[in-house]
């Protein structure tokens, strides 16, 4: 395999070998080619119901928004990289308010049939897991029994000889009231339902507060009569029933989890609704992943619920995450943040995304990932991404636990390094962006001219994400196969490109950053091209069964 410059790469493999692919780049610096398909240097793919849009800015440079090309490559009269194609996903993003409106639509649909308050219908639907057919069947057979069972029938619970019927479901003040819960006799506010079971307001509040966390129907403390949302708010003195609404919404989404998925990102309450799920089996069969984007611009896989994980499919991703969760949190932190200088053994803590390290003590330059000298990394390939089998291991049982552990530790370290580096790059990029923005305002640079930094940062982040998950693919792949070796070569090329772009973020002077704007665009374009190539090569590994997780 030969190598060249960023804009002049050529890799060719025997077309008769069914395990190989051809991958080459055009000498035209404005485009690159995979399997005969020509792509512009910077491809922008955005997804609105999975429709791809290519956007070009005023300088003729494509802008990067949120995704890499994830579609099959084809070529006339040539072997297809991986047979088959998948239909576009049609989805919409909703808030909890939008979900609740859909729940109320179901209630309104049943209102003419049931002829009971909407709040009661909502309770019935939740009790039957939103199975309308089952609810209608039971309602037809034993309507009265069902209402009594769920505490929705007041007539069955009313105490005939009580004095509270004219004031039920209201907070009242009473003198010398004795509460049978706390056994206190005092002047206090009280509350009771039609059943006449009356208690002091403090006891009722404690009771409701405990029940709200359970998310179930709240009934009277002495019978099955149910409290409605307005009752809860009256007793608590503020809108507390919203917690029950949250529980109802969660129940609705859980029941319809084939079509509705919560965004898995922390503190995000967005929900994605996939209108048609019939295409999901085809995505799985062809080793594509149905990636979607929520209202907060978080991209995740609708199928497995993890972050965007190309080139790994959902099965590889799930297996990798399950294995990674067994690791010690302390070990993860040590691997992520600290290492000894290979030359003088001084402890070094990483505070940036770039993997080119310079020891402050002895000035030794080394690679954070492989701990080797940095000089060789500037040429040819990023060799530290290649797992090397020791010769001694060849004579051992391939199932040897020690060998497997070493292999996993190697790839897990790489996975973890790029995950941490992505976060550090992003934080550093945001800081630089603030400085560049201030410079724009000070010297009058247009908004468009300053977009190169955020665009490059998005490309870098996506490149690191794809590179990160490529190590999971490499771990589960047959290392002896020719296509796996090609995949590793593509990893090296992307790793080189990512590190080269990341180094530009180390520039601290805004004026220098602006002068090097063309370099940001060129390197970002190369990162994106290499990212796309690695994704497609990884998918072929999966399609051909060269990469597969153990059952």
From Swiss-Prot:
The keyword Nucleus does not apply. Zn(2+) 4 binds at residues 367, 370, 377, 384. The active site is at residue 354. Pathway: Protein modification; protein ubiquitination. GO terms for molecular function: ubiquitin conjugating enzyme binding; ubiquitin protein ligase activity; zinc ion binding. Keywords: Metal-binding, Repeat, Transferase, Ubl conjugation pathway, Zinc, Zinc-finger. A zinc finger (RING-type) spans 179-225, 341-370. One of its GO terms (cellular component) is ubiquitin ligase complex. Zn(2+) 1 binds at residues 179, 182, 200, 203. One of its GO terms (biological process) is histone catabolic process. Interacts with the E2 ubiquitin-conjugating enzyme UBC4 and histones H3 and H4. Members of the RBR family are atypical E3 ligases. They interact with the E2 conjugating enzyme UBE2L3 and function like HECT-type E3 enzymes: they bind E2s via the first RING domain, but require an obligate trans-thiolation step during the ubiquitin transfer, requiring a conserved cysteine residue in the second RING domain. This is E3 ubiquitin-protein ligase HEL1. It comes from Saccharomyces cerevisiae (strain ATCC 204508 / S288c). The gene is HEL1.
